[in-house]
Amino acid sequence: YDAAAYTDMLVEWGGDSWASADNFMNGRTNGVATYRNSDFFGLVDGLNFAVQYQGKNSNRGVTKQNGDGYALSVDYNIEGFGFVGAYSKSDRTNEQAGDGYGDNAEVWSLAAKYDANNIYAAMMYGETRNMTVLANDHFANKTQNFEAVVQYQFDFGLRPSLGYVYSKGKDLYARNGHKGVDADRVNYIEVGTWYYFNKNMNVYTAYKFNLLDKDDAAITDAATDDQFAVGIVYQF
């Protein structure tokens, strides 16, 4: 998730091209041990890395299961710029291996950000293999994913945000002897803003322009509706 975190900054949506909870080590999950190191043992300022291990979990629904796996991320931050690369690989359970090709689930991702002078801008690209779950609970054999976000913090409290999220599924529903199909599974623009009254309280609103084609949505069983959100947050 360390690479996806750079662009998972949208007002309401975002971060869902490939990262999701309880999907191997791509988000909040269970049965993991994590080691993080800052400034590379004190030798290189801004160079950080993390190593993660996840134990086998086969006692849940097939989309929430995982075999033994490991993950690694490395990031470097200097003068407002940040760069990160992440990779993870896990065994698939016997139930999962029956859906698509391969006994392993993998993801790699690269991201970059600029966070200075009241500006936040970030981009992320990543690919998954036998890992990403479609809306109809099938695993995608491969996905190609891109996310981008830009925001500006005004001194009077307004923080407008513009984000884009895209994910293309490749070779979907392929089986031995049967070729799969390609289809977009996520494709939208989010326009939104926060307004901060003080450090404890803010209001926000966002609109999601869903660009997903109905033909692609019919293949992946994804929604095509636009969405709107408004809310208020108070932090004690």
Regions found by a protein language model. Give the residues of each.
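Detector for outer-membrane/organellar transmembrane beta-barrel domains
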Residues: 65, 70-191, 195
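Mature soluble domains of exported/periplasmic/lumenal proteins and thiol-rich metal-chelating peptides
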Residues: 142, 184-186, 208-209, 213-225
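Outer membrane beta-barrel
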Residues: 1-56, 66-68, 75-82
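Outer-membrane beta-barrel architecture
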Residues: 44-50, 80-82, 118-120, 159, ...
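Outer-membrane beta-barrel "beta-signal"
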Residues: 33, 195-197, 223-236
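Surface-exposed loop and membrane-interface regions of Gram-negative outer-membrane beta-barrel proteins
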Residues: 1-21, 55-66, 93-100, 177-180, ...
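C-terminal closing repeat unit and adjoining cap/tail of repeat-based domains
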Residues: 190-208, 212
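Short, aromatic- and cysteine-enriched interfacial helices/patches
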Residues: 41-44, 140, 211
